[in-house]
């Protein structure tokens, strides 16, 4: 196979908000160009995971090489990078965009521009991409093409007069989309004779091949038998085989400049293939590395514990396997007095956390308890040291702390203006600070600064219920700001439960504490003695609920008569209960943990 001339290659990604039809459009492009036969075609070809198909979201970015005979009679190679639309997987988007020269912006003709449309388009603009707007779902009765074109021009500032109109579902307008890719997107640049310079876009683990590495070649060429070096890690590998996805893996002789493909080199761990690294030839290295990506840092942490302690080793094996495919997921062992052994895991956001939990229970058949999600706090100590806190239970003594800083985000929310009041109230309740408010037709766009701590709990669910599901939400991390944060502990029978401790803002502590205590009271079964459930900040109790004791009627045998006999029996019972309370252990059922952590705070 000879290398394709650069002017016959187009590398592009498809960016859009969730549910605007990216994956369906990808399916149509693959079908139209003959990437798969009609028999092999299935809905959402590029969404390999069951969870992706069920939730209708794309999690891992995928890549496909399409061969297209254009109207000018020439044959072009189109490399499509499918990207996720959800905010948690923004790092997947940034990787795909760095490997392309152009983007197709898909906007639902009935919904219009949404929050994540904006976030992803701005990423594409930052990468100096040529952008072709495509209006999808024009066959829907609710489609309003002119309104959406005006929105694209007003909100994003792109000229939408020649936007391509299509319906990925029915196949209308797909040939026009392919023509627009060829005529309006630029070809890649590159020198086939220069030393090899390739960008490592992604890596995943395959049971047979070991680690499969997805690359975009900028200069030089890559072929089997070549000795290559990773510039970031310094590791060297001998390439076993080189290929492309059509979307089936197909071996090729070599990859030239501008091409996107994969190679295997018996690399043992995905961690050895750092995403964003530059790959070059060991004998003839390139002088400078490519601009990589920002290091992905976990934003939300939570503890995962097996319901049955005997499953701990299975959980260890499962998180290890997930880490092979998802370098942004981190974990370390931790033990809790209440829940036993488990792992403290780091995620990119709440959806990421939910997906990993679901994959653990579905693919590895594990029953898990997740502790309350918390964010990373920066703590300045009196002696001048700074530490990062991942687990609220590990907070140092209050007397040593100078200040606690928490992460803040910039949240962009699009909502129909009927629900604007409720959305603003929600943001204000969560200590938000309004930055701007503007209208796009009948929809409002509000931008707020919010503490991430207030968002990770249940902000997204509340936003969806306030707006009847119409609001869309996107966020970027801004900075760390000092705040009046306190550690709230939950005590059951005067014993602190480490898995339920959390850092909260002082102004919210009382309501959060009361809610937790009420929830626990409903779920802890009655014992033979009274059980106080308390929320405390340091030594000060801020909320209390009591689980009443079960009581045996000890005076039932006394027929009539002597009051002192009854009194004696009651006193004896009282003494026994007092002793029981002193030495009795309260078993907290698993569902009490799960419910307390899922607590909604209306």
UniProtKB/Swiss-Prot annotation:
It catalyses: GTP + H2O = GDP + phosphate + H(+). CDD domains: EF4_II, EF4_III, LepA, lepA_C. InterPro entries: EF-4, EFG_III/V, EFG_V-like, EFTu-like_2, G_TR_CS, LepA_C_sf, LepA_CTD, LepA_IV. Residues 7-189 form the tr-type G domain. GO terms for molecular function: GTP binding; GTPase activity; guanosine tetraphosphate binding; ribosome binding; translation elongation factor activity. The keyword Transmembrane does not apply. Signal peptide: none annotated. It is an enzyme of class 3 (hydrolase). Keywords: Cell inner membrane, Cell membrane, GTP-binding, Hydrolase, Membrane, Nucleotide-binding, Protein biosynthesis. GO terms for biological process: positive regulation of translation. One of its GO terms (cellular component) is plasma membrane. Required for accurate and efficient protein synthesis under certain stress conditions. May act as a fidelity factor of the translation reaction, by catalyzing a one-codon backward translocation of tRNAs on improperly translocated ribosomes. Back-translocation proceeds from a post-translocation (POST) complex to a pre-translocation (PRE) complex, thus giving elongation factor G a second chance to translocate the tRNAs correctly. Binds to ribosomes in a GTP-dependent manner. This is Elongation factor 4. It comes from Caulobacter vibrioides (strain NA1000 / CB15N).
């Amino acid at each position: 196979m000879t290398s394709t001339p650069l002017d016959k290659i187009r590398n592009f990604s498809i960016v859009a908000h969730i549910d605007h039809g990216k994956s369906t459009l990808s399916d149509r492009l693959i079908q139209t160009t003959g990437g798969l036969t009609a028999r092999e075609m299935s809905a959402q070809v590029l969404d390999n995971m069951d969870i992706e198909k069920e939730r209708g979201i794309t999690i891992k970015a995928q890549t496909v090489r399409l061969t297209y005979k254009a109207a000018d009679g020439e044959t072009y190679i189109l490399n499509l990078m499918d990207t996720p639309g959800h905010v948690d997987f923004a790092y997947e988007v940034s990787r795909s965009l760095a490997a392309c020269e152009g983007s197709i912006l898909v906007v639902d003709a009935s919904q219009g521009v949404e929050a994540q449309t904006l976030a992803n388009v701005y990423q594409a603009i930052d990468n100096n991409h040529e952008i072709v707007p495509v209006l999808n779902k024009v066959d829907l009765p609710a489609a309003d093409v002119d309104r959406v074109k005006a929105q694209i021009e007003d909100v994003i500032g792109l000229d939408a007069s020649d936007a391509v109109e299509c319906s990925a579902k029915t196949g209308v307008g797909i040939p026009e989309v392919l023509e627009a890719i060829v005529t309006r997107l630029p070809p890649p640049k590159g020198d086939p004779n220069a030393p090899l310079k390739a960008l490592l876009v992604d890596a995943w683990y395959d049971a047979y091949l070991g680690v499969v590495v997805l690359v975009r070649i900028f200069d030089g060429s890559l072929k089997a038998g070549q000795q290559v070096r990773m510039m970031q890690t310094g590791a060297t590998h001998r390439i076993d085989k080189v290929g492309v996805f059509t979307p089936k893996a197909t071996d090729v002789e070599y990859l030239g400049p501008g091409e996107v493909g994969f190679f295997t080199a018996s690399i043992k761990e995905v961690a050895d293939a750092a995403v964003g690294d530059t790959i070059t030839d060991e004998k003839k290295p390139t002088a400078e590395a490519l601009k990589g990506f920002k290091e992905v840092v976990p934003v939300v942490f939570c503890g995962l514990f097996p319901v049955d302690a005997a499953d701990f080793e299975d959980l260890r094996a499962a998180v290890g396997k997930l880490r092979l495919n998802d370098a942004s997921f981190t974990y370390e062992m931790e033990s809790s007095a209440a829940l036993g052994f488990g792992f403290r895991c780091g995620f990119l956001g709440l959806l990421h956390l939910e997906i990993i939990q679901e994959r653990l229970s579905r693919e590895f058949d594990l029953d898990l308890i997740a502790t309350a999600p918390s964010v990373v706090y920066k703590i300045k100590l009196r002696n001048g040291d700074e530490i990062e806190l991942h687990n609220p239970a590990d907070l140092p003594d209050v007397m040593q702390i100078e200040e606690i800083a928490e992460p803040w985000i910039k949240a962009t929310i699009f909502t129909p203006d009927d629900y604007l009041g409720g959305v603003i109230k929600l943001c204000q309740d969560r200590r938000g600070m309004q930055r701007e408010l503007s209208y796009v037709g009948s929809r409002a766009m509000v931008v707020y600064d919010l503490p991430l701590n207030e968002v990770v709990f249940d902000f997204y669910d509340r936003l969806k219920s306030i707006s009847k599901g119409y609001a869309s939400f996107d966020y970027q991390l801004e900075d760390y700001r000092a705040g009046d944060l306190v550690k709230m502990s939950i005590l059951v029978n005067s014993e602190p439960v480490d898995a339920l401790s959390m850092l909260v803002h002082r102004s919210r502590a009382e309501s959060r504490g009361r809610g937790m205590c009420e929830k626990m009271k409903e779920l802890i079964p009655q014992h033979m003695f009274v059980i106080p459930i308390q929320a405390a900040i340091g030594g000060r109790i801020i909320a209390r609920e009591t689980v009443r004791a079960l009581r045996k009627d000890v005076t039932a045998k006394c027929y009539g008569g002597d009051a002192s006999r009854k009194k004696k029996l009651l006193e004896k019972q009282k003494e026994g209960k007092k002793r029981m309370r002193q030495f009795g252990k309260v078993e907290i059922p698993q569902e009490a943990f799960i419910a307390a952590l899922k607590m909604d705070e209306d």
